């Protein structure tokens, strides 16, 4: 499934714009299966890594198993993502805005919503912490009559109509997912 997005800037743009409900993205890079190594512990392999013209960085994870989308995995991905994106001497305020997006087969957060946007908040005031790190979960079982519902329908159609590789990833073509006709 993720190979659909490798180098396909328009397809990646369409996916991100649908999930983030934006229409102003300019994706300048899309790579699949990017490994972020960690000398001191666990490394991660990003299903889809992308960045846009504003310098925002995206990690999109396509998960068929609920166990692959636990909150602790989002925490690990965001920490290694940040470590990879920073340089020695860089001001903290210059860190790029990051998005970790999990597209899951099921409603792993069990709230019946199509999308869950997780932002850190100051508990005593309820104000946003504004650390420029965002986590988004997309409920793959959602079938509403809207852009997210249609996108998840297409993801599900790919899953059912194609073989599954040994890694548990769905195999599909860009016409299945990234076609204005199907969205």
Positions of predicted regions on the chain:
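Elongated, amphipathic alpha-helical interaction scaffolds
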Residues: 1-183
